[in-house]
Amino acid sequence: MATPKQAAKKASKKRSGGRSAKAGLIFPVGRVGSLLRRGQYARRIGASGAVYMAAVLEYLTAELLELSVKAASQQAKKPKRLTPRTVTLAVRHDDDLGMLLKDVTLSRGGVMPSLNKALAKKHKSSKKARATPSA
């Protein structure tokens, strides 16, 4: 039997977890940090830089997925899957992501649907309005 002191000591020695868990993130902070160091974007990379970068990547990914799901649900009654087309439509319709990714070409995304005003069909006016009175 463990004494109460030993039990309290064991409970306080919980495993601390990784940096992602400490920061409350899903994206791997360690992997992002190693990729930052390997890419040689700067001579030195601080510990908080990897956490911040992972948080930004996680936020942008969540935002992109949320908008893509909305775009897919607007296209079909029951959205079954996200395609590059729905991601492209979501990015181009959102103001902030559109500005951020304005020079990015998404593979298999297609183009934004737009119709030139000159090519749009003109509605015919009613027959009564077109008829001229005979004199």
From Swiss-Prot:
Transmembrane residue ranges: none
Main location (coarse class): nucleus
PROSITE patterns: HISTONE_H2A
Protein localization: Nucleus; Chromosome
GO molecular-function terms, A-Z: DNA binding; protein heterodimerization activity; structural constituent of chromatin
UniProt-listed CDD domains: HFD_H2A (cd00074)
Keywords of the record: Chromosome, DNA-binding, Nucleosome core, Nucleus
Protein family per UniProt: Belongs to the histone H2A family.
Subunit-level organization: The nucleosome is a histone octamer containing two molecules each of H2A, H2B, H3 and H4 assembled in one H3-H4 heterotetramer and two H2A-H2B heterodimers. The octamer wraps approximately 147 bp of DNA.
Stated role: Core component of nucleosome. Nucleosomes wrap and compact DNA into chromatin, limiting DNA accessibility to the cellular machineries which require DNA as a template. Histones thereby play a central role in transcription regulation, DNA repair, DNA replication and chromosomal stability. DNA accessibility is regulated via a complex set of post-translational modifications of histones, also called histone code, and nucleosome remodeling.
Name of this protein: Histone H2A
The organism's taxonomic lineage, starting at the top: Eukaryota, Discoba, Euglenozoa, Kinetoplastea, Metakinetoplastina
